[in-house]
């Protein structure tokens, strides 16, 4: 038991810490409640304060002197001590108040009475307390007014445990007094004696005890008659939690002459108010008095007698109790009525909300005002809603569909995405042709290839062989397309050696040709434009027939051409592929007939058919403004039959056909499928690649043209906004507008092209497919830009530059053209664009030069460079490069930049300044300083 503290031993012995410290104070050692005790000290204390045997504590029985028996609630002691004890002769009321004595003589303590001799369990004494009632009653733990206490107990009271004699307490007997273990005297308390006196910690008239219990004129840690409390309580008839002075308390209850909880020093006035138990000569009345509360507050009159106080307290307490009970009932009734009303409103609200659900059809983008109009709410309500979400908007601000849907859902509106209708596509839309009306039509063939590989020579050879009809003078009319008759079968050739018209047609969705003839020189093999032509044809989805030209030359190597073309997916039939290879010679006319036969065979295999008995529909091949004839358009009729006098529309142009001229220069009145003709009668020059359609009337044709004009303007704006670039690629992927990323690669060597192509293709993911539509060697030319514009592609160039014309076209067509010197940078940029993390490009910009003139040393700073700015400016946030001769000695930030003693942000040319460099002091006079900043380069 060594090291037991004073307060622990005091608690065990049911005494105060001060009792122990006072006992041990004779020794030299100073003791506090937290001081440790040795075994010898503990033993001496136990011997001093050990309780006496119970048999010695039983007082002699005395006749009861109360007017009414009261039940004892302490079941352990209910059979002991049938009669109360007489008060000790030597103990007197120190106040000298005889009336107090008389009144005290009427008290009967239930501990000294048998349960069988008492009235019923819930006591009938009106001055009683709940389960422990009597006239000036007994309580379990914390009791007031002439009362019994539990542990450290005082005069006129009985104790709870192991108790009991008349007016006496556990182990200690005395007239009008209780002595727990070492406690003395009437109106006195443990270890301290005397009327009007205080013990242990807290003081008050008719004094206080140590902890939680109250006695007549005394309390433990709580308040007595005219006294103060232990810790947070004030004297003068008032205390927090437990009070004495002619009163009883249950736990948080107040007695007469006392103030409310946390009462003020000096306030009394027969007042009791705390919790639900009563004091002031009215010890609780919880059972017999309908939970009535105690007497009202009044100013205490020192001249008033205890009897008069008791009398007033009872009368006033009854009145006050009724009043408080009535107020409590009213408050409870009001509170219940409030709670009852709330649930009734909720179901009605929900039903209302279900009734007001609306369905909205929303476009891709709309303004706040338009959304509010569709929802039938005030625009200010939407602005407020967004403001509360931390978004500051105006009613004219545009939001996308997702944001609009989120707002609408909060207003109980269900949204559907508006299906965008392409008006032009609807106008150009065609119904399926019935099979029984379809007839075979001539194939449309385009000749493509590298420069000087013999495209023009091959066309001339075909024309010389099969074109018989010529105009007078022997000059063939060149209208951009012509027909060749091969054994009674017609073949239409498009005389478009360049790729501009071809890509323009594909850009507008027109399938102008059925078969592409790829001309490759047998002595040169595959060249850059050959690869470009292959990519164009594949992008258009047309059949490719390879014409290996110049086989008459000595160094011709057909097998080499076949081998080179296999790298681009064109594998000869005799090599196990599906591509037709025809060796020809435009010079000797060798292989021309075989080439034409293969064209007819391919057309037959593809089953090229059209319906001639319908309104005509075709494509504009070329168009020009003739001085004598006006707008002239060379067209290719693809479906139906076109007649002179038909009303037609071609994009934004319309008119009535006045004349038609065929490829031989003859005027014709009708033109069937796959027939090229020149038409006159349009109001303007149409663009190459526009769709030409016959209409029922000129008015209808004009209406179609006007629709094309208005929709064309909108499409131009949309195309400008949605042109593909790496910067905006991720947003377009997220919006679902991008499923395929087309890339054109140009490099200085073929190996770089192949390496990048394979690397970029591997970047494809679930949301977007990377597709390299063209890869070639050489500078970026206009044809590359036109292909990129038509295919909505990005051009990536390595160690090559675009020519002037290509740069102009790229700027005009808004084509994203990127130049790289390192392959991996391009791969990283495309990968970052796919992930939406494209970082801006920064480049170094030199802003100024300075010379170090003198060195200054400063403690704690290091070397300071005294400089003069010779050119430009030096800024505080710039990065400097210090050179000594041709050697760079430092590159890093400036730690400090001063002009005289002032820290500055910038020093201009001709100004002296002082500079300190971060973690660098090895500077010398005549060192040169170059300052630069990093600026973002527009991408």
UniProtKB/Swiss-Prot annotation:
It comes from the Bacteria. InterPro entries: EF-G-like_DII, IF2_II, IF2_N, P-loop_NTPase, Small_GTP-bd, T_Tr_GTP-bd_dom, TF_IF2_bacterial-like, TIF_IF2. It holds the Pfam family EF-G_D2. Keywords: Cytoplasm, GTP-binding, Initiation factor, Nucleotide-binding, Protein biosynthesis. Residues 549-552 are annotated as: G4. Transmembrane segments: none annotated. CDD domains: IF2_eIF5B (cd01887), IF2_mtIF2_II (cd03702), mtIF2_IVc (cd03692). The keyword tRNA processing does not apply. Residues 585-587 are annotated as: G5. Residues 440-609 form the tr-type G domain. GTP binds at residues 449-456, 495-499, 549-552. Its main location: cytoplasm. Residues 79-93, 131-257 have a biased composition (Low complexity). One of its GO terms (cellular component) is cytosol. Belongs to the TRAFAC class translation factor GTPase superfamily. Classic translation factor GTPase family. IF-2 subfamily. This is Translation initiation factor IF-2. The lineage of its organism: Bacteria, Bacillati, Bacillota, Clostridia, Lachnospirales.
